[in-house]
Amino acid sequence: VYIMILPAFGIISEIIPVHSRKKIWGYKFIAYSTLSIAFIGFLVWGHHMFTSGQSVFSQIVFSFITYFVGIPTGVKIFSWILTMYKGQVSFTPPMMYALSFLFLFTIGGLTGIFLGAVALDIHLHDTYFVVAHFHYVMQGGTIVAFLGGLHHWWPKSFGVMYNQTVANIAALGVFIGFNGTFFPQFLLGLRGMPRRYATYDEQFVELHSYSTFWSGILGISIFIAVMNLFWSFIKKNKVDPGSNPWGGMTLEWTHTSSPPHPHNFEEDPVLQHGPYDYDK
C-alpha cells in the first residue's frame, strides 16, 4: 500500500501548486517524507498479523512503527494545505480530484491508526472496517490521484481538450459515490460484519444496500470521466500546439508543443525561472 501510494503523492504535489498559482510549501519536507514512507513501508508488515499469535513484544514494535508512518504522511497533507492557503485556487477538473484526494486519503490515514492499535485491531481485523480503510487509501488515494493526473496532462499528452464541465460533474460524482459506497462499510466493520461473506445477518442489510446503491453512482461517474476523455479524440477538440491551459511553469508546459515531439524539445531549453515561481 505504501509503495503504491508514492506515485500518487508526486501527482498531487504537481497538481496543487499549478492550480493554486503558488509555490509548493515545504518542498524539501515533502521530498524527505516520501523517502521516509518508502523506508518505513518495509518495516510495518507485522501489523497485519496481530491476530496470528505474535509475541507481545512484536505487537508493540510493529504497532509503534505503524504509528510512525503518520508523521511523514501528515507532513505532506499539511504542506499541500499550506500550498493552497492564500493561493489562487482554480476549481478545474485536476484540482477537483486533488481536493477529493486530500479528503479521502486523510480519512484512510486516520482510520489506519485504529488498525495499528493492537487492542482495536483484535476486534476490527478481517471486518468491513479493513475493507473501507483499504479502499479509502488505494482508490480514494491512488486511483483518484491517477484520474487527476490524467485530466491534468491530457491536453499536453494528446493535444486535445475534454469538456471541463462534464469532467467536474464526474469528479463530484466520484467523490460523492465513493463516500456513499465505502463509509457505510466502516459502520459495518464496527458492528462486527466480517469480510468475504456472501450471506450475512439481517442487521447488516440496510448498510449493505446503501453501499451497493452508491457503488453504482461511483461506477457511472468513473465511466463518464473516462468517456469524456476519449470523446475529446472523437470530437477532435484540438488545442493550440503551444497551449498551456493550466499555466504550468515546468518544462513540458513551457518548452514543448501539445502533443510533444518525439524528442520533446526542438532546441535546448533555456531556464528563466523555477518550476513553481508563480509569484515572479
Go through the PLM ranges and name each one.
Residues 1-280:
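Membrane-embedded and interfacial regions of multi-pass energy-transducing membrane proteins
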